[in-house]
Amino acid sequence: MSQQPNLQALFERPTTLPDPDAQGRLARLVGMDDKIKRLANVLGVLINPAGLRKWQDKHHADAGTLLDAVIRRPPLVVLSGDVGSGKTELAETIGDKVARQEDIDITLLPLSLSSRGQGRVGEMTQLVSSAFEHAFHEANKFKSAKGAARGGVILLVDEADALAQSRESEQMHHEDRAGVNAFIRGIDRFANGGLPAVVLMCTNRLNALDPAVRRRAADILVFERPTAEQRHEVLSRRLGSAGFGKADLQALVTATGEQPTRAYGFTYSDITQ
């Protein structure tokens, strides 16, 4: 009889938010103000829709049907972009802003890469199911029959294309296909339970995700490489106090952008690491 995996095998560094470290990391993300605001608002509605209902009752009392359509979206958000585009850092820290915004505690559960398993029969399905079961149990503690949620859960899945890749691939192993099925069942269980929980996925291969997963996403945020203006902001924050003048910074902005021999500019991590 197979053993249930322990929490250390399922999650990497579970965190309770708000947290000063996460707040500081989020503040250091440059050029992402629009994405931070959009993601925080989407997660806030999915985790704690009571605030939106209160606003609707006050300003648009006859818009209940529209509000239900917004609130009933599956609790799944996908962040897609190149490696180093900042999506994982944002995913790991955005819960702090949501926690402060909604005035609740958020439990961040980063799904461990080891949860993919080693290919043994039934292993991946059991690991994914156990992760969702624990997240469901935690979120159920915060559920409120009436009024605002008492807390929330974010289940973070990095490198999601390795876990929820398309089942349409002819090369896909049966075990992987079963794992994707378990993943979709987990998302649907969150949605049907009306829990204060959301699945936040990061991928650099959006088209590799299973179509059923993409269809369930309440929102998909695409991360591009930083523009010249954004590169200048990053560089000036890092180097401005070190004596780099305007001409020096502009030269670095140009050097980190597209070149005749390179059809793409630097990512955020290329510049900062």
Name the predicted role of every residue range.
Residues 11-50:
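Charged, amphipathic alpha-helical linker segments immediately N-terminal to NTP-binding catalytic cores
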Residues 34-40, 51-250:
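Walker A/P-loop NTP-binding motif of AAA+ ATPase domains
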Residues 28, 87, 263-267:
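Generic alpha-helical structural element
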Residues 1-10, 49, 54-55, 104, ...:
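Compositionally biased, intrinsically disordered low-complexity regions enriched
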Residues 19-28, 77, 220, 258-260:
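Short hinge/gating elements
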Residues 244-273:
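Conserved AAA+ ATPase small/helical "lid" subdomain
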Residues 9-11, 184-185:
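Short, flexible segments with low predicted structural confidence
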Residues 1-6, 26, 89-90, 156, ...:
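N-terminal accessory segments that target, anchor, or regulate ATP-driven/P-loop NTPase machines
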